[in-house]
Amino acid sequence: MNMPFPSREQVESIRKNYPPDTRIVLNNMNDPYSPVESGTRGTLRYVDDCGQLGVAWDNGRSLSLIPGEDSFRKLTQQEIIQEQGMKVGEMVL
């Protein structure tokens, strides 16, 4: 489906809601050729002028999200704390 090009105001709103380093989890990606698996987490790197979110996925992939096409959400503060705890635990072992 072709999405209309977002206005400058819409892009700025996306940038405000998704600043760099925001942690994201993918619910579903509408890409039949090379989708990222549902449940994959990643870190937002940028929002481009088309309003697409450039994400560095934890599985090593780099594929943008398209708001309105792909389903995703920010990680909750509790999920972020749990991730940080796992990383600390991994370093101790």
What is the meaning of each model-derived region?
Residues 2-85:
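Basic/aromatic-rich interaction segments and small domains that mediate binding to polyanionic partners
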Residues 84-93:
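Non-Sec secretion/translocation targeting segments of pathogen effectors
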